[in-house]
Regions:
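Conserved hydrophobic residues forming the short capping helix/wall of the S-adenosyl-L-methionine
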Residues: 20, 65, 179-180, 210, ...
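Alpha-helical recognition/docking segments in bacterial nutrient-uptake
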Residues: 33-147, 151, 211
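Periplasmic-binding protein-like
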Residues: 88, 96-103, 158-160, 213-223, ...
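Hinge/beta->alpha junction and helix N-cap segments in small-molecule ligand-binding domains
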Residues: 46-56, 74-83, 109, 134-144, ...
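Short acidic capping loops at alpha-helix termini that bridge into adjacent secondary structure
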Residues: 155-156, 187-191, 241-246
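Flexible loop/turn connectors
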Residues: 207-208, 212-312
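N-terminal helix-turn-helix DNA-binding module of bacterial transcription factors
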Residues: 1-39, 312
Length: 312
């Protein structure tokens, strides 16, 4: 009756609706899910909910899932393998219909390989095998950023990253190395700084560059969040960007165009990432018999602004 059964008369329907109003009745989603064997819920595990990049992607995911009658169950792994695996397990216990995971760990560390045959899974920015996946052209994006710095005369370029393994860190690292190689510049590995994920890691890594590596003229950061921290560390010392040191970020979060100077960065297509992941998981939920797995590869775009100085 509640689903619009045509065999129920209008008179009976009105009586039931009146009784529901008097009792302040709300249809029980759990009861319906037990009958239909579905919760109409998709679990989403992101790496850092404070990062505007993830916020924008989640908005896109939620928009599409809501249009298909699904809700989002969100968890924040904080770039830790333990929390990622913990939240995946908890979501399965809560009977979500599928999972979208922004993967932060390797094949050996992740439990996705163990559960992908019992629940639909889509990974984002991941190299895990045999799952539907949404990736961006991270190697190309990083290559363009570092190549641009080199073309502006910078040869000593620091790279700030988080201290964990996943495909987008690996691919951005490949782009960093390839740009140096193609321009005939030998890489000094001390310029690659990594840190555990903390609110101040970018600030501390930038101070290490400024204290220990005075020859560095540019910093490339794994994401714009780290670039924001680098700005703060540099400006707290009374130094100027880009006159004293240049910065290039990654993601093109909304804040990037509001920073002073505006941040040169690599843009990721946040809306398309979220929409693609949501479409893949709904397709997989509705037809779990599919044997082939799909990888969506989306392009990045290099955005030139005011944070890089030509020092040739």
């Amino acid at each position: 009756m509640f689903n619009g059964n045509p065999s129920v008369s209008k008179k009976t329907k009105r009586k039931v609706e009146k009784a529901m109003e008097e009792l302040n009745y709300i249809p029980n989603a759990l009861a319906r899910s037990l009958v239909n064997k579905t919760s109409n819920t998709i679990g989403v595990v992101v790496s850092d909910i404070t990062n505007p990049f993830f916020t924008e992607v989640i908005e896109s995911i939620e928009e599409y899932l809501n249009s298909q009658g699904f809700t989002v169950f969100l968890s924040n792994s904080r770039y830790t393998v333990e929390k990622e695996n913990q939240y995946i397990s908890q979501m399965i216990e809560k009977r979500v219909d599928g999972l979208i995971v922004f993967n932060t760990c390797t094949e050996e560390e992740s439990i996705i390989g163990k559960i992908k045959n019992i629940i639909p899974v889509v990974t984002v920015q991941s190299a895990l095998k045999e799952t539907d996946c949404v990736n961006t052209s991270d190697e190309t994006g990083a290559y363009r950023a570092v190549d641009y710095l080199i073309k502006q005369g910078h040869k000593n370029i620091a790279f700030l990253v988080y201290n964990f393994e996943n495909s987008n860190i690996s691919n951005r690292m490949k782009g960093y190395f390839k740009a140096h190689k193609d321009n005939g510049i030998e890489i000094n590995k001390k310029y690659i700084l990594s840190s555990d994920f903390t609110p101040y890691c970018g600030y501390h890594m930038t101070n290490m560059v400024l204290d220990k590596m005075p020859e560095v003229t540019a910093i490339f950061t794994y994401n714009d969040q780290l670039a924001v921290s680098a700005y703060y560390a540099i400006q707290m010392r009374g130094l100027r960007i880009p006159d004293d040191i240049s910065i290039v970020g990654y993601d093109n979060i909304g804040l990037a165009s509001l920073m002073r100077p505006t941040l040169t960065t690599v843009e990721q297509p946040t809306y398309e990432i979220g929409r693609s992941a949501a479409e893949l998981i709904i397709s997989r939920v509705r037809d779990q018999r599919k044997s082939t797995h799909h990888t969506v590869l989306l392009p990045t775009k290099f955005i030139v602004r005011d944070s890089v100085k030509n020092i040739k």
